[in-house]
C-alpha cells in the first residue's frame, strides 16, 4: 500500500457509488483491472466485473494481514506473512524485556475479527498466552479477558515465573 497508496472506500455499500465506479472505469477506457487487497476489495472486484457486464476483466491479488480470505490451506497472503514475521520478532523482544524486568506485557495484534495474526505471532514467539476472537466468541467482555489473564499469571507464578507476555 505504500507505493500504490491505499483506500478504505467500499462502493458496494451504495448502488450509486458502484455505478459511479463502473462509469468512471468505462470512461477511462479501462478493460482490465487488477485489485490488491482483502475480503472487501475481493468482493468489490467481483461486483465491478458483474456491474460492467463483462466489459471489464478483473484479477484480484489477495493481500491482507487478517489472513481471512478463503484461499487453499497453507496459502497465506503476502501481507499476512510480512506482518506475522515482524510481529513475531517484536513479541520475542518484548518477551526478553519481560524476563529481564520481571514484568508482564500485553501485545495487541491487528486483524479485526480474525485471530490469525495474533495466533501466528504468539505461536512464533512462544508467548505465554495468546487470545484469539475465534475462541472467545462474538461478544468478549473485559471481565472474561481479565479472568483468563489472571489465571495465566497465577499459573506462571506457581511455576516460579514472575514474567510473561500475552498476545
What annotation goes with each model-predicted range?
Residues 1-28:
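Glycine-rich nucleotide/cofactor/substrate-binding loop typically near the N-terminus or early
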Residues 1-8, 63-75, 100-102:
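Gly-rich Lys/Arg/Thr-decorated short loops/hinges at beta-loop-alpha junctions or inter-strand turns
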Residues 12, 41-42:
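Short glycine-rich, flexible loops that bind phosphorylated cofactors or substrates
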Residues 24, 32-37, 43-47, 51-59, ...:
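Accessory alpha-helical/coil subdomains and C-terminal extensions
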Residues 38-39, 64:
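An acidic- and aromatic-residue-enriched active-site/binding cleft used to recognize and process polar
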Residues 10-11, 65, 136-137:
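Residue-level detector of flexible, active-site-proximal loop/helix-junction positions
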